[in-house]
């Protein structure tokens, strides 16, 4: 599978989903690299018309969005498989026609980041600690996009993960989210992110000598 997203890419994706969610589509579009904006991939040509009440994203659009924003290689086949496997319990069914909501897209991006360290079963159980029933948003301990933004904020940090509790609690106090599971899941996501980052660095270093 493709490279893990670096902290900057995670932040860009988080911002894009957030702007789309609050209806600031121009700000979302401004995040794409200039060459992409000049020639949007066909899946994203209508992105400027995106309306949160009316539009969802297909799996191909979820993939195209991440790849165009971050130069990643997320695969539609992988996600298609997830929607048939155990992990579909956490993604939920397509909500808007045959398409997924932006919150569901955030869950898919999280799954992609976590799959490097945890099995799909572990990942499902882990995300179920904060996202209860994927087909309803109101029972989540935190909205998926807001959690993805929190994760983006901390993915940049290099402090020891077990020392992040106090800081993360302060970040959360500024929001309406208070459930202790949020911090536990955040830390597990950060472990996954760091393990993969270290693995990548190690391999790049090795390749200089062999």
Predicted regions and their residues:
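Intrinsically disordered, low-complexity, charge-dense segments enriched in Lys/Arg
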Residues: 123-210
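Short, Lys/Arg-enriched N-terminal segments with co-localized hydrophobic residues
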Residues: 1-3
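Basic helix-turn-helix/winged-helix DNA-binding cores
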Residues: 5-129
